[in-house]
Amino acid sequence: MQLVLAAKYIGAAIATIGLIGADDKTSNM
């Protein structure tokens, strides 16, 4: 149960960070 919530939360956070800091952090991967 916690894994699903964590995965969803982390996924949203990564998506937001990716959208916001796309230009700043191009070498994220």
Swiss-Prot record:
**Where is it chiefly localized?**
mitochondrion
Q: Which GO terms describe its biological process?
A: proton transmembrane transport
Molecular functions per Gene Ontology: lipid binding
Question: Is this entry keyworded DNA-binding?
Answer: no
Q: Please tell me one Gene Ontology term that the record gives under cellular component.
A: mitochondrial membrane
Whether Transmembrane counts among this entry's keywords is yes
- Subcellular location, in the record's words? Mitochondrion membrane
Give UniProt keywords alphabetically.
CF(0), Hydrogen ion transport, Ion transport, Lipid-binding, Membrane, Mitochondrion, Transmembrane, Transport
* Family, per entry: Belongs to the ATPase C chain family.
Q: How does it assemble?
A: F-type ATPases have 2 components, CF(1) - the catalytic core - and CF(0) - the membrane proton channel. CF(1) has five subunits: alpha(3), beta(3), gamma(1), delta(1), epsilon(1). CF(0) has three main subunits: a, b and c.
- Record's function text: Mitochondrial membrane ATP synthase (F(1)F(0) ATP synthase or Complex V) produces ATP from ADP in the presence of a proton gradient across the membrane which is generated by electron transport complexes of the respiratory chain. F-type ATPases consist of two structural domains, F(1) - containing the extramembraneous catalytic core and F(0) - containing the membrane proton channel, linked together by a central stalk and a peripheral stalk. During catalysis, ATP synthesis in the catalytic domain of F(1) is coupled via a rotary mechanism of the central stalk subunits to proton translocation.
This protein is called what?
A: ATP synthase subunit 9, mitochondrial
Which source organism does the UniProt entry give?
A: Wickerhamomyces pijperi
Q: What is the lineage of its organism?
A: Eukaryota, Fungi, Dikarya, Ascomycota, Saccharomycotina
